[in-house]
Amino acid sequence: MSRFARLRSPLWWLAGVALLLGQVAHAAPLSIGQLMAALAKNPQGAATFTEKKFIAILEQPIESSGELLFIAPARLEKRTLKPKPETMVLDGDILTLERGRRKHVLQLKDYPEVAAMIESIRATLAGDRKALERVYHLALDGGNERWTLVLTPLDPRVGAVIARIRMEGLKDVVHSVEILQADGDRSLMTIEKRAPQQ
């Protein structure tokens, strides 16, 4: 099994969390610059998710649900609650995976292609358009009422894993993130932003 195959699940959620926690408060038409500026104003956020993974060798999609959390500048968490508890935490350049009693800690420096993609996700969260465009081609369609952002990898090494990331939003809410892998498998995550706790 390749290094990319072992990290397939973490890659799916990292891309999804990149935009799910941002809000867009600008009038239509919406530009990439406006979207990035809005994301840069959000130091943290939380959401619930439902995810379906469509894998070629399986007749039915794999479904899961749980919670997502982002804390600027570099911490991302995905806590799957159903069907089985699982936790994935990215903190700095360390990715920690916990499934039952098993815990795996990975150094991103050992996975340069994966690190490049994750840094692009962080750049999105930070609203750093220049850093994002060093790795992806960005295409934004629509306006503030309904918009779609598509990220296409520029680096062939990243493109060997992820074909594209498609994010759709309605007004100031990102409601879906679809990730198409180079091998044809894909995931679709629907997100509901959680209100801040009092």
Segments and roles (model prediction):
Residues 2-14:
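Bacterial N-terminal signal peptides that target proteins for export
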Residues 12-22:
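Bacterial N-terminal signal peptides
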Residues 28-55, 59-61, 99-154, 161:
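Flexible, processing/modification-adjacent segments and terminal tails
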Residues 49, 76-79, 95-97, 149-151, ...:
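Short hydrophobic/aromatic-rich beta-strand segments that constitute the beta-sheet cores
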Residues 60-66, 185:
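Amphipathic hydrophobic-ligand
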Residues 63-65, 84, 91, 159-164:
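Short, surface-exposed coil-to-beta transition loops
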Residues 67-119, 187, 193:
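An acidic-aromatic
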Residues 129-136, 142-198:
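Gly/Pro-enriched, hydrophobic low-complexity segments
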